[in-house]
Regions:
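Soluble catalytic domains of enzymes that build or remodel membrane lipids, polysaccharides, and related
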Residues: 5-259, 269
Length: 269
C-alpha cells in the first residue's frame, strides 16, 4: 500500500497573496498512476483517501493513469472511496497515456466524471479566486489520435489579464515539458508517469530520460513535483520506490521576497 509523502514549497506572488491563504497554506493532495482495473481495485484508492483525510487537503489532483483498463472497474466502489475525503476545492483529474491505452479515452474520462472528478483536457479554471489550474492532455495523445495536444500558451490564451498575476498550477502526466511550463510562468507543475522505474534497473532509464524523474525540482519560482505513483503497472511489485500519495503544502509570500532569476537549481527526493 502507498505511503504519504510530504512536500513544502514557497510561491512568490507578483501581486497580493490570495486572501484565503494569507494566514494559512494551501494543501494539495496528489495521486498519480493508480492503474485501476483488473489488478488494482478501488480498495487502493480508499487507502489513499484514508492517508489524505487527516491532512484535510483543500483539493486533490489525479495526474493521469488513474485507469489502466475497464475490466473490473467498479464505479460505485470508486465513488465511495473518493467520498472518504471531501476537499472543499474538489477532485480534479487529467488523462495519462493509459487512459488512451485502455481502449477509449472518452469512456475513461466519462468514468472519472461519473465517480466525482472534474476533468481538464487542455483547459484552465480559476480555483477559489486564488490560483489558476491548467490541466493538460497527455503528451502521448498524437500516437493515439493523430492530433497534437494544445500548447500551454494556447491553453492560457483566453486567460483574462486580471488573473495573470495569480499562481499557475499545471497538471501534466508526463514530466517532459518542464521548460515549456517554466516559460509560461508556471509556479507548480505536478506529474507522474515515471514510476521511478518501478523495478531495478529501470530507475536508471528514468534518470537519463527525465530532468526530474521523481521528487521536487526547484528553479527560481518554478517547482516541478513528480510522483513515483500510487499503484503499479504490470506486476504488483516495486523495488525502486514505495508507492506514494503526495501532500503538497504551498506557502505564499509577497513579491518583495521573491528569489533572484539566478537562484540555483534545487532538487529533493
Amino acid at each position: 500500500f502507498p505511503e504519504l509523502r510530504h512536500y513544502n514549497i514557497t510561491i512568490h506572488m507578483q501581486g497580493p497573496i490570495p486572501s484565503a491563504y494569507v494566514d494559512k497554506p494551501l494543501k494539495l493532495g496528489v495521486i498519480t498512476d493508480m492503474h485501476l482495473g483488473r489488478l488494482i481495485t478501488a480498495g487502493r484508492l480508499a487507502r489513499s483517501m484514508e492517508l489524505l483525510a487527516p491532512e484535510k487537503p483543500d483539493a486533490i489532483f489525479y495526474v493521469g493513469d488513474i485507469i489502466d483498463d475497464h475490466i473490473k472497474l467498479d464505479a460505485d466502489a470508486t465513488a465511495a472511496a473518493l467520498a472518504l475525503t471531501q476537499p472543499p476545492l474538489g477532485h480534479w483529474a487529467v488523462p495519462g497515456n493509459h487512459e488512451y491505452i485502455s481502449g477509449s479515452i472518452d469512456k475513461s474520462m466519462d468514468f472519472l466524471r461519473r465517480v466525482g472528478m472534474q476533468v481538464l483536457r487542455d483547459q484552465w479554471v480559476m480555483v477559489d479566486d486564488s490560483f489558476v489550474l491548467a490541466g493538460r492532455d497527455d503528451l502521448g495523445k498524437p500516437g493515439f489520435t493523430g492530433t497534437q495536444r494544445a500548447s500551454l500558451t494556447d491553453i492560457l490564451a483566453d486567460l483574462p489579464a486580471q488573473y495573470r498575476h495569480l499562481p499557475l498550477v499545471v497538471l501534466d502526466h508526463q514530466p517532459a515539458a518542464l521548460d515549456e511550463a517554466r516559460e509560461a510562468g508556471t509556479a507548480l507543475m505536478l506529474s507522474g508517469h515515471t514510476h521511478y522505474g518501478q523495478l531495478w534497473p529501470f530507475n536508471f532509464v528514468t534518470e537519463l530520460k527525465y530532468e526530474n524523474p521523481m521528487g521536487l525540482l526547484t528553479k527560481g519560482n518554478f517547482h516541478s513535483i513528480v510522483s513515483a505513483g500510487t499503484g503499479t503497472w504490470g506486476p504488483p511489485l516495486r523495488t525502486t520506490s514505495r508507492a506514494q500519495v503526495l501532500l503538497v503544502t504551498v506557502h505564499f509570500v509577497a513579491e518583495d521576497k521573491a528569489p533572484a532569476d539566478n537562484t540555483p537549481e534545487e532538487k529533493a527526493p
